[in-house]
């Protein structure tokens, strides 16, 4: 869905860089995993490709990375869109997701359909199962392996659910996008958020939970494009 979204954005005269963060997708694997390092990765990427300023869209973990990057390097950020996350700590457990993925012996999996059938033991949402199956890729021996560094992500996911702390506020405007059916953004934590992002705006997308770009891609695209 991010690929589809990025293609549509690029058709509106934007140069788009679609980045996988460390231990995710096609990016490198590392035993170290926290927001400070992911901000460093993004800054190094911009330096490597001589990018002087950006508009950033970040969802969930990517949203927290985007917020910390903007706090540390405000002069490099033109527009900031944070999708269904706040700079606060969350008491959410991802154990079921990690358990489901790590319980599969990928050497015995012969097809994606077989992988999806295994995940049905854990999840009822077919769309979410398909989302998790995007972690699969073919290994050199013709079998399957995970793109993401699942074992390290499980070991360090408390770093992802932790809050973003910084000694200065971000003085530019920022747009927070909330999914109507998601509980990641609430009024109490918005008060905390306003201390770091006093000029924030909030919009809500109907018929969507946490995975807004997947559940209501049309409204999500329209809101992002209009803001950019």
Annotate each PLM feature.
Residues 3-11, 15-57, 222-225:
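Active-site loop/oxyanion-hole signature of alpha/beta-hydrolase fold enzymes
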Residues 15, 50-55, 77-79, 173, ...:
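Structural signature of beta-strand start/N-cap positions in the alpha/beta core
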Residues 58-62, 66:
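Gly/Ala-rich beta-loop-alpha elbow adjacent to hydrolase catalytic centers
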Residues 21-25, 87, 209-212:
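Alpha/beta-hydrolase active-site loop signature
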Residues 92, 107-161:
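Conserved alpha/beta-hydrolase catalytic His-Asp/Glu region
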Residues 67-72, 77-110:
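Flexible "cap/lid" loop of the alpha/beta hydrolase fold
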Residues 208-221:
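Catalytic histidine-centered segment of alpha/beta-hydrolase-like enzymes
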Residues 140-196, 201-204:
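Conserved serine/cysteine hydrolase catalytic core
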């Amino acid at each position: 869905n991010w690929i589809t979204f990025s293609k549509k954005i690029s058709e509106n005269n934007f140069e788009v860089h679609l980045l996988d963060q460390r231990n995710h997708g096609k990016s490198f694997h590392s035993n170290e995993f926290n927001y400070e390092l992911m901000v460093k990765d993004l800054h190094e990427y911009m330096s490597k490709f001589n990018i002087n300023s950006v508009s950033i869209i970040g969802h969930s973990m990517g949203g927290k990375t985007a917020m910390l990057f903007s706090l540390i390097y405000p002069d490099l950020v033109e527009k900031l869109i944070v999708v269904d996350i706040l700079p606060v700590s969350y008491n959410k457990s991802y154990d079921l997701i990690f358990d489901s993925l790590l319980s599969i012996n990928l050497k015995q999996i012969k097809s994606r359909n077989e992988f999806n059938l295994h995940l049905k033991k854990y999840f009822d949402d077919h769309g979410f199962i398909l989302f998790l199956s995007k972690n699969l890729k073919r290994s050199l021996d013709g079998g399957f392996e995970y793109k993401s560094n699942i074992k390290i992500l499980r070991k360090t996911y408390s770093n992802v659910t932790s809050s973003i702390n910084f000694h200065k506020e971000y003085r530019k405007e920022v747009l927070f996008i909330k999914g109507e059916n998601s509980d990641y953004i609430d009024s109490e934590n918005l008060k905390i958020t306003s201390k770091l992002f006093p000029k924030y705006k909030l919009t809500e997308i109907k018929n969507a939970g946490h995975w807004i770009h997947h559940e209501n891609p049309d409204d999500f695209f329209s809101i992002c494009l209009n803001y950019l």
